[in-house]
């Protein structure tokens, strides 16, 4: 049984890039698809797809630039044993705005910039640099 599926997703992406894999696969969920959508919109991954009906699998195609991984660091912040919630004013800036923080808000998952412009806070799921 997996206790933290988001941390598992981040670990699979981190390990896949360390091993210079083209793509990584993991069990799919709505939250993982939303995170993959954010990563694609921000240019951290090439693409993703969901396949299978009984046990859906999420395949994430990793992105490299001149042989180096695009995601230098991906880290889980809020975890099941210690949730981290921040208001709009307290939302963290990752690498002075060069990275993103993934925020779970009442309006869905969004980046720290989008949450700040919408004026809403939420749970800080992780950082991507």
Swiss-Prot record:
- Record family assignment: Belongs to the universal ribosomal protein uS8 family.
- Keywords of this protein's UniProt record, alphabetized? Ribonucleoprotein, Ribosomal protein, RNA-binding, rRNA-binding
Query: Which organism is this protein's natural source?
Result: Colwellia psychrerythraea (strain 34H / ATCC BAA-681) (Vibrio psychroerythus)
- Name the NCBIfam families on file: PRK00136.1
Q: Which GO terms describe its molecular function?
A: rRNA binding; structural constituent of ribosome
- HAMAP family from the entry? Ribosomal_uS8_B
This one is known as Small ribosomal subunit protein uS8
Q: How does it assemble?
A: Part of the 30S ribosomal subunit. Contacts proteins S5 and S12.
Q: Which Gene Ontology CC terms are recorded?
A: ribonucleoprotein complex; ribosome
